[in-house]
């Protein structure tokens, strides 16, 4: 319930990825300008292996696992041994869906895998407000006033058992 979340988010630059997740959990979102950017609901992983570099340098680099931990770092070993990215992509897909579901709940919109929002796109402030990804344009003062107004409403409701 929006009245339980008496927190406002104020965007004065870029609110992307995890910041978007956190920011949209507020009761109200304000954005300073059409030049601000929000979105980037996506997930990625960067992979680097230095094994060949170490080998060329004469360094014997080994990862040794006990037989009882055969699934430890399975995804990484699948890339290194077989150039197979699928295990990591499967894990990333699960985490991406968790991210999308959280954004869907925060914004009160249905998850649609075809929607650019859920595919990682960044939006300018005007597009974000028009699509309902941000509540309104405003200043930091507007955000503070909103929080104070919510606290006042809550207090009045408590006083009169509303």
Where do the model's predicted regions map?
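N-terminal organellar transit peptides
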Residues: 1-36, 41-162
């Amino acid at each position: 319930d929006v009245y339980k979340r008496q927190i406002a988010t104020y965007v004065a630059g870029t609110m992307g990825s995890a910041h978007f997740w956190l920011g949209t959990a507020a009761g109200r979102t304000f954005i300073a300008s059409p030049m601000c950017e929000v979105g980037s609901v996506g997930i990625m992983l960067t992979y680097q292996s230095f094994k060949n570099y170490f080998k060329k340098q004469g360094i014997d680099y080994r990862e040794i696992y006990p037989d009882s931990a055969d699934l430890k770092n399975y995804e990484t070993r699948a890339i290194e041994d077989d150039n197979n990215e699928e295990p990591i992509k499967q894990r990333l897909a699960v985490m991406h869906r968790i991210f999308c579901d959280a954004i869907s709940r925060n914004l009160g919109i249905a998850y649609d895998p075809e929607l650019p929002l859920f595919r990682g796109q960044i939006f300018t402030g005007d597009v974000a407000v028009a699509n309902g990804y941000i509540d309104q344009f405003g200043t930091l003062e507007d955000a503070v006033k909103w929080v104070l107004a919510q606290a006042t409403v809550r207090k009045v409701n408590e006083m009169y058992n509303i």
